[in-house]
Swiss-Prot record:
The active site is at 128, 146. The chain crosses the membrane at residues 15-35, 47-67, 75-95, 107-127, 141-161. One of its GO terms (cellular component) is plasma membrane. Keywords: Aspartyl protease, Cell inner membrane, Cell membrane, Hydrolase, Membrane, Protease, Transmembrane, Transmembrane helix. It is an enzyme of class 3 (hydrolase). This is Lipoprotein signal peptidase. Its main location: membrane. It is a multi-pass membrane protein. It comes from Vibrio campbellii (strain ATCC BAA-1116).
Length: 168
């Protein structure tokens, strides 16, 4: 016996509006940063004793992973993002829209991934602007897309614990 396919309205694909919202907000903020802030440490804006706005280019991935390479990493991370986006969209098409937790998590990851892919393809780098620090230690700069990817991933991990506890 086969399962009845979900319509677009019934499936989690309905939650892709959130991915679009994340993408638009991410690109909009990055454009404001690029148009209104000087590049680099000397042009940082001190906001709080532990937080700066800082316009920098990231040629790698999270934590500037592989940023010192010759440029091939740009296409590797773009390819990974396309595969992940396709996979998550497929999973959303199989999930009922009422399963909000996972659909929201997937949409947050998709929106962030597409935002960073846009930067990589259009600029050749990802724009980062959030700089948190404690004393002289600075966490690697990041952006809204990175934040939504991490929140979505954390939601998926937490969901694994929720389901595990529910089976006890």
């Amino acid at each position: 016996m086969s399962e009845k396919a979900l319509t677009l309205k019934q499936s989690g694909v309905r939650w892709l509006w959130l991915a679009i919202l994340v993408f638009i907000a991410d690109i909009g903020i990055k454009l404001v940063v690029m148009d209104n802030m000087g590049y680099g440490w000397a042009n940082r804006i001190e906001v709080l004793p532990f937080f700066n706005l800082l316009y920098v280019h990231n040629y790698g991935a999270a934590f500037s992973f592989l940023s010192d390479q010759a440029g091939w990493q740009r296409w590797l991370f773009t390819g990974i993002a396309f595969v992940v986006t396709g996979l998550l969209t497929y999973w959303m098409s199989k999930l009922p829209a009422k399963e909000k937790w996972n659909n929201i998590a997937y949409a947050l990851i998709i929106g962030g991934a597409v935002g960073n892919v846009f930067d990589r393809v259009v600029h050749g780098f990802v724009v980062d602007y959030l700089d948190f620090f404690w004393g002289s230690y600075h966490w690697p700069a990041f952006n809204l897309a990175d934040t939504t990817i991490c929140i979505g991933a954390a939601m998926i991990i937490l969901d694994g614990f929720r389901k595990k506890d529910a089976n006890k």
